[in-house]
């Protein structure tokens, strides 16, 4: 199981190459991330 920044993302566990987790989904657009 691979998670982005050590964070589980709902049903998406393969978040290595994503910026963050939004609405239990991996997000790859910085605009979708809450900074």
UniProtKB/Swiss-Prot annotation:
CC annotations in GO: extracellular region
The entry's note on the tissues where this protein occurs is: Expressed by the venom duct.
Q: Which PROSITE patterns match?
A: I_CONOTOXIN
Protein's name in the database: Conotoxin M11.2
Q: Where in the cell is it found?
A: Secreted
Keywords of the record: Disulfide bond, Ion channel impairing toxin, Neurotoxin, Secreted, Toxin
Q: What is known of its domains?
A: The cysteine framework is XI (C-C-CC-CC-C-C).
Going by the entry's taxonomy, the superkingdom of the source organism is recorded as Eukaryota
Q: Which family does it belong to?
A: Belongs to the conotoxin I1 superfamily.
Record-annotated disulphide pairs:
2-16, 9-21, 15-26, 20-33
**One GO MF term attached to the UniProt entry:** ion channel regulator activity
């Amino acid at each position: 199981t691979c998670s982005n920044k050590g964070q589980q993302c709902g049903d998406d566990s393969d978040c290595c190459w994503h910026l963050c987790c939004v609405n239990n989904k991996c997000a790859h657009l910085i605009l979708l991330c809450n900074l």
